[in-house]
């Protein structure tokens, strides 16, 4: 005699209560209404406290909350001469923002009332795409609140499977009888959620598909070029003979500039110090400073290492030493040529032809030959369209081939074993439970501790662990910032979804259970129990608490950025002079990491979509998170991070991940149908069909999106001349920051900085003292030449002719 679905469901509920949640777990232990009211109240209180503390720190802590504004206002000109009465655009915009940012809490209201146009003018086109993506998610989740709270939640609550004492459980799908026809509503709405989300993402894509002329380049990046070739004419000759009618306008060789870039940064740092104290000495006389990093810790002047020295002389001598080292390294760079070149052509059609000729070289196809084929060895070349010069990380170009792949594989293998086998948050917390660490907490029997503490701990792990992924991407030494952000985004998202959604949902909450689930053959026979963990009432409450914590306490901590604040305060405390403090402020204003922020946001979005049907009360809290995240990101992009510009791959990857997020909800419904109503039930078959159709639609959308973007790179009908494609004779008018040459090699005129100082009394001139107006003019010109492009790492799209 077979058991009924109802009795089978009751049996599984009894089994999984002990199997999914450890007997003394402080994380997944049931509480009245899941502890949600307590967690919500505590998060509101903490969020208010964090905002108040940050309002004080943002200006009290040496302009910590306004670093993005300081990278424009703290130029050498303002450092030496003070703020000027007349500022050219866009500096006027930043000064206006500073004038509006005078009160204790004006920054908060400015973030709410800030116009999108002001944000886009300062932060660039990528900021517009990012906030538009958030707008689409917010509107989508807002629409989801209507069926989730108006239809699914009442249907769940009027069910009869659970007792009336189970307050939170009655709001979940567990309370719906397996014989009820209302289960059709859950399956239908899960499929409708996917279709609606797909439509919203498609509409969002229409707003940032790259225009033809903006993304087309006439420059090719060629690797595996023999390093013995030193004459650009050899490369030009090959292309001219192999492709008749081809005109090469420029050939750029690449060099190993890792050491040169580091020396240049130190040299410019010393240069700022010398210029600052030279100007200050003219006004107030000789300035004495302590140069030891720990001099602020000791107020005694008797220690030799803490003695004061002449600031102007110190920085002049330091600049002279670093300049000599820089010039010596600059002379050696020519001997460190890489097997990588950038070739710019006059005709866009030629670029397409050459690129297609080398596209299938790995399949045995031979490219066109020339009389110098044996010299250039073009059969070994790998040809690709060149990224924008501002997108290239020049110091990483020297790390390639075996060393790059060995580093990449070693780093990611370590991360995989660390994250997926040992350190998911639920595994760590329950492993701690095994050693009685949390027994004092259990004795308190307070939902404040037993519910709020675990949700904060889960949030902390989901922040700290992706930071390891984030920093590991820098160790991988990617060639472009776009690829670096893309890798960060994919790794963080995949890791977070497994760590936060999939493993805890299936009850894999302790290391021994996880290893048994992976490797024990007999344990796998009872794998059905694992999937039942998805549908326990307390499991949904656990994820609601996580979303609440991320929405309030989490966004508050994103404002605070404790790690950056500690680093900032420490570096300022150990600084030796005002120029160093300006340098610290500028360097700490990092680019806004779109990849990391996308991953964190989409992780919470995936949690909401996974439980939007089985636990519909999570949807309004997901809306709260998206709204708070949007406000926080607007503030951070404008005030705390430097502008950045990437290619469309980052934003398209976010769209793909958002499209696949509702599939989790469909899979959850399929598991529920199989386990509760049977694998051959009509609801189960409908859920399976919905998943198949949704997967086909999702992959079709991805392929169509990639195809559409690929079409934009095809040759445009009407070509527009870009700054890269001008004739060599016009290079004098070409901005040096837009050449395919490392920035450190573009300014040879700055290798030596003629300025009188006590350390160097003469630079070979007859005049002992320059005219005051002449020196002031020179310093102003140098300041303008040195600063404008240094702190804007953004990728500017070429050929912007509107």
From Swiss-Prot:
In which tissues does this protein get expressed? Expressed in podocytes of kidney glomeruli.
Listed under GO cellular component are: endoplasmic reticulum membrane; plasma membrane
Q: Which residues lie on this side of the membrane: Cytoplasmic?
A: 61-124, 206-401, 477-480, 574-593, 641-647, 703-802
Q: Which residues lie on this side of the membrane: Extracellular?
A: 1-35, 158-180, 432-446, 518-540, 613-615, 677-681
Tell me which domain of life the UniProt entry assigns to the organism this sequence originates from.
Answer: Eukaryota
Q: Where in the cell is it found?
A: Endoplasmic reticulum membrane; Cell membrane
Annotated region Disordered: the residues are: 753-785
Sites where Phosphoserine occurs are at 75, 78
Q: Does the keyword Ion transport apply?
A: yes
Stretches that traverse the bilayer: 36-60, 125-157, 181-205, 402-431, 447-476, 481-517, 541-573, 594-612, 616-640, 648-676, 682-702
Q: Which UniProt keywords apply?
A: Calcium, Cell membrane, Endoplasmic reticulum, Ion channel, Ion transport, Membrane, Phosphoprotein, Transmembrane, Transmembrane helix, Transport
Record Pfam families: PHM7_cyt, RSN1_7TM, RSN1_TM
- GO annotation, biological process: glomerular filtration; monoatomic cation transport
Membrane topology label: Multi-pass membrane protein
RNA-binding: present as a keyword of the record? no
Tell me what reaction this enzyme catalyses.
Ca(2+)(in) = Ca(2+)(out)
Q: Which family does it belong to?
A: Belongs to the CSC1 (TC 1.A.17) family.
The record describes the protein's role as: Acts as an osmosensitive cation channel preferentially activated upon hypotonic stress. In contrast to TMEM63B, does not show phospholipid scramblase activity. Enriched in mitochondria-ER contact sites where it may regulate the metabolite flux and organelles' morphologies in response to osmotic changes. In particular may regulate mitochondrial motility and function in motor neuron axons. Required for the functional integrity of the kidney glomerular filtration barrier.
Subunit structure as annotated in this protein's UniProt entry: Monomer.
Query: Under which name does UniProt file this protein?
Result: Osmosensitive cation channel TMEM63C
Organism name: Rattus norvegicus
Which lineage do the record's taxonomy fields give for this organism? Eukaryota, Metazoa, Chordata, Craniata, Vertebrata
